[in-house]
Design a protein with these regions (language model features):
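Glycine-centered flexibility motif
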Residues: 5-7, 25, 54-55, 61
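Unchanged
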Residues: 33-127
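Short, flexible beta-strand-to-coil junctions
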Residues: 11-12, 20-25, 64-66
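A short gly/proline-enriched turn/hairpin at secondary-structure junctions
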Residues: 27-31
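Short, hydrophobic/aromatic-rich beta-strand segments within well-structured domains
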Residues: 17-18, 72
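Conserved N-terminal beta-strand and adjoining loop/helix that marks the start
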Residues: 1-16
């Protein structure tokens, strides 16, 4: 099972984090879940490993992407147009996005499905 992180700004609407994988291009942070690891734990771990960011897992949805979980994570750091470096050697850069970047490993339809998802219908992880 894998997890995808929908990391959004708690300060500004419409901003989310993507990472630029050296071989695949721009994608949402995420990866394989460890044995016994809950989706929200895996999401927070992957977000930190790939983007160097900490956040609060708010909700989870297992129907958005086939074979995986999407975890909504709120991040309370300033939104900036400037990219930053990742601690993960496979990640070229990290940045806040307002639209799906060119050279995206994800199809625009997949991202739009997540952008437009009504998280109130998902499993809440508390406040």
């Amino acid at each position: 099972m894998f997890v995808v992180v929908w990391a959004v700004s708690s300060r500004e609407d419409g901003c989310w984090i993507m990472v630029k994988n050296r071989s695949r291009g721009w994608e949402l942070p995420g990866g394989r879940m460890g044995q016994g690891e809950a989706p929200e734990e895996a999401a927070l771990r992957e977000l930190f490993e790939e983007a160097g960011a900490l956040g609060t897992a708010k909700a989870i949805d297992s129907d958005l992407i086939e074979g995986g979980h999407v975890v909504l994570v709120e991040i309370d750091i300033p939104v900036s147009p400037d990219p930053w470096k990742s601690m993960d050697d496979s990640i070229e850069e990290v940045g806040w996005c307002l639209q799906v970047p060119e050279n995206s490993a994800w199809g625009g339809e997949e991202i739009e499905r997540i952008i437009n998802h009504d998280w109130s219908t998902s499993i809440s992880l508390g406040s």
